[in-house]
Curated annotation (Swiss-Prot):
Mg(2+) binds at S40, T62. It holds the Pfam family MMR_HSR1. This is Probable GTP-binding protein EngB. Keywords: Cell cycle, Cell division, GTP-binding, Magnesium, Metal-binding, Nucleotide-binding, Septation. The keyword Cell cycle applies. Residues 25-197 form the EngB-type G domain. Its cofactor is Mg(2+). Necessary for normal cell division and for the maintenance of normal septation. InterPro entries: G_ENGB_dom, GTP-bd, GTP-bd_ribosome_bio_YsxC, P-loop_NTPase.
Length: 197
């Protein structure tokens, strides 16, 4: 049974450039991943809201960094633009990737990055490039496998093992979630809250 949690949360605003980033007064947890991997859906599930984060059936809906304030800004959830968006122009891609890189490198109150991977397609080269980049820049991250309801248990175990072997870092946790069946949500929430203390 999934534990129900009522969260005091609200959308702060979306930052489309460095100057519009909010102050660093509260700890932040960021969610990253390829376009349409399920970041917005996961955020909605974490805070028990169907509408807090905009969910799109088309890749690349999020073109800015969206901030969600929790418990009167005790901490924040951060929805990063999806990388690998085929619908974005070259100029748009350069602009929002530059913003994301700046945020991840310079944000002093960033506690953890959760990298979402679609378990149906496993690690893509663009995911590996992003994880390499995080590692090179000494940015702490964990991996969250999404859409696990679309993969049978045997294949899921193989995906977890291959992902763990490729990352080869014991400090990186690999979580499994399905927004549809809310699998492992209690554990994901516990991991989420741990970094906001």
């Amino acid at each position: 049974m999934v534990r129900r949690i009522t969260l005091n949360s609200n959308f702060m605003f979306g930052a489309s450039d460095i100057k519009s980033l909010p102050n660093e007064s509260a700890p932040e947890i960021a969610f990253a991943g390829r376009s349409n991997v399920g970041k917005s859906s996961l955020i909605n599930l974490l805070i028990n809201s169907k509408k807090a984060a905009r969910v799109s059936s088309k890749p690349g809906c999020t073109r800015q960094i969206n901030f969600y304030s929790m418990y009167n800004d005790k901490f924040r959830l951060v929805d990063l633009p999806g990388y690998g968006c085929s619908h974005a122009s070259k100029d748009e891609t350069i602009q929002y990737l530059g913003l994301v890189e700046y945020y991840l490198i310079h944000r002093r109150n960033l506690r953890r990055v959760f990298v979402l991977i679609d378990s149906k397609v496993r690690l893509k080269e663009i995911d590996k490039d992003f994880i390499y980049w995080l590692t090179y820049n000494n940015i702490n991250f964990d991996v969250v496998l999404t859409k696990i309801d679309k993969v049978d248990r045997e294949n899921l175990d193989a995906i977890i093992e291959s992902t763990r072997k490729w990352i080869n870092n014991e400090s990186v946790s690999i979580r499994q979630i399905s927004v549809r069946v809310k699998y492992e949500m209690t554990k994901v929430r516990d991991e989420f809250f741990k970094f906001t203390r």
